[in-house]
Amino acid sequence: MDDIRVLIVDDEPDIRATVAEMLEIEGYSTEEAANGADALAAIERRQPDLILLDMRMPVLDGWGFAAEMSRREMAIPIVVMTAARDAARWASEIAATASLSKPFGFDDLIRTVNEVRGAA
């Protein structure tokens, strides 16, 4: 990859680490954030090419994060990743590009990220 940066936003450290490892195998650069507030700070430091976003997190959840991104007029593709059955609906609510239902495997993750990057 030409240094394509993916920001992984999830309150579960094991999920962040596993997703980062899978993406790095495929050549993506990753950064991790434990909640929406940490993600906004990470974006201020260096804007990613894509965001993988959990919806249910403490401090600032996925909805609040997406609202703040919209308020700041930041157009970074977002993939919602959640264990809830409503992943696709939630993705639609926040105008995300795609969704992944947890648990997801390597192939689903890489296919979704590649599709979103191809559409960007």
Predicted regions and their residues:
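Non-catalytic signal-transmission and effector/linker regions of two-component phosphorelay proteins
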Residues: 1-7, 13, 107-120
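Two-component/phosphorelay signaling modules centered on CheY-like receiver
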Residues: 13-31
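Acidic catalytic/metal-coordinating carboxylates
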Residues: 34-38, 60-64
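Short amphipathic alpha-helix used as the core "switch/output" element in two-component signaling
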Residues: 41, 63-74
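Active-site residues of response regulator receiver
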Residues: 54
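Receiver (REC) domain active-site loop signature in two-component systems and cognate sites
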Residues: 57
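Alpha4 helix (beta4-alpha4-beta5 surface) of REC/receiver domains from two-component response regulators
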Residues: 64, 85-101, 107, 111
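Hydrophobic/aromatic residues positioned on beta-strands within the core alpha/beta folds
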Residues: 79-82
